[in-house]
Amino acid sequence: MLDESSIPVVREDIQYRELNDGGVVYDTSAERIHTLNLTAAYIWNCCDGSRNVMQIASELHEHANVPIDKALNDVREAITYFEKEGLLHS
């Protein structure tokens, strides 16, 4: 399980484009595209090294007006995916 104190940071060589309904991530080294929904795009934009998992969940909770446990679950799920796909610094 993802530690709530972990501080996710997006790799510098990853390109991101915001869309009306989320965003698109392009991994230049793997030449892969990842489509993000609005929630995942919000979380992606928070992975700048200035917040830990719990802080991102708290911001999502307030921004999207969802219960904190749902926000934390969404953050864990998204960051786990980002890690699995190699989009974050290890």
Provide a role label for each language-model segment.
Residues 29-90:
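Long, charge-rich, low-complexity alpha-helical segments
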Residues 1-41, 45:
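Acidic, low-complexity/disordered tracts enriched in E/D and polar residues
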